[in-house]
Amino acid sequence: MAMTAAVKDELSRLPVTTTAARKAEVSVMLRFAGGLHIVSGRIVIEAELDSASIARRLRRDIADVFGHPSDLLVVQAGGLRRATRYVLRVARDGESLARQTGLLDGRGRPVRGLPSHIVSSSAQIAEAAWRGAFLARGSLTEPGRSAALEVTCPGPEAALALVGAARRLELSAKAREVRGVDRVVLRDGDAISALLTRLGAHDAMMTWEERRMRREVRATANRLANFDDANLRRSARAAVAAGARVERALELLGDDIPDHLLQAGRLRLEHKQASLEELGQLADPPMTKDAIAGRIRRLLGMADKKAIELGIPGTESGLTADMLDA
């Protein structure tokens, strides 16, 4: 099953116990998947979804939480439609539901972003908002260079509100416009896993992480297999050895590390087989390989000095024979 379908299937079956979270999820789903229409002088709400289980979930919550009936139409694939779509329509009580969910403000005007009670609420409501947005218009690509969790938004105001909801979950998301369409995107692998966990898609998160790890292992194996030059092999071993020393240095120094040295050390740990030049390019802002090497040397020097003062093993204590055989 594709990752997008797997996440949506799991979220569509996730039980949500609090009424506030269910209300927020419905509000955001209607905002992202639907629209307000005037039919014979009455407001009608429609939401177009790509899964029968999502449509059933939304229909059930509208009835249980807001007390309104709805109609479900199935639009079969054909012509320009590549997949079957499910259209949920609330006609009889459309205006009442629009006001209850915050699609209309107190004066009966359409809300361009998300309702204020969602924008300024708790982390639990932020999770519900993201869950509703993903169920409505979300996608998740396979792990790789272009991996992304993305939500297509109905406008820039809604996109910025979703970015704010991610910030309340301590996650960094970016709003961007591509060919006139507003989107919110997460590209960092750890952030994607964290968001899937917060939303309740635990099985999908484990599958995504497994595929991500498999790809990283395969990429590392391919990289090593292509090391035709012995100097590159020695450089890789030296980088791994430096990573082991840096790990010991961070243990020794604890919190007593200047920020610029800590950044260099973390880069070395996160990219253990990267060259110094590659590490410099990964730094923010980028720096030369000599600058990154100098910072790592100073970090190791500080740690070894402290180890001598304390009479304990220094940064070279974690090196193995394979690492030293350069």
Curated annotation (Swiss-Prot):
Give the molecular function GO annotations. DNA binding
User: In the UniProt record, does the keyword Protein biosynthesis occur?
Assistant: no
Give the record's keywords alphabetically: Cell cycle, Cell division, DNA-binding
GO terms of biological process kind: cell division; regulation of sporulation
- What Gene3D superfamilies does its record include? Homing endonucleases (3.10.28.10)
Q: Which residues bind DNA?
A: 275-308
As for family, the record states:
Belongs to the WhiA family.
Function noted in UniProt: Involved in cell division and chromosome segregation.
> What is this protein called in UniProt?
Probable cell division protein WhiA
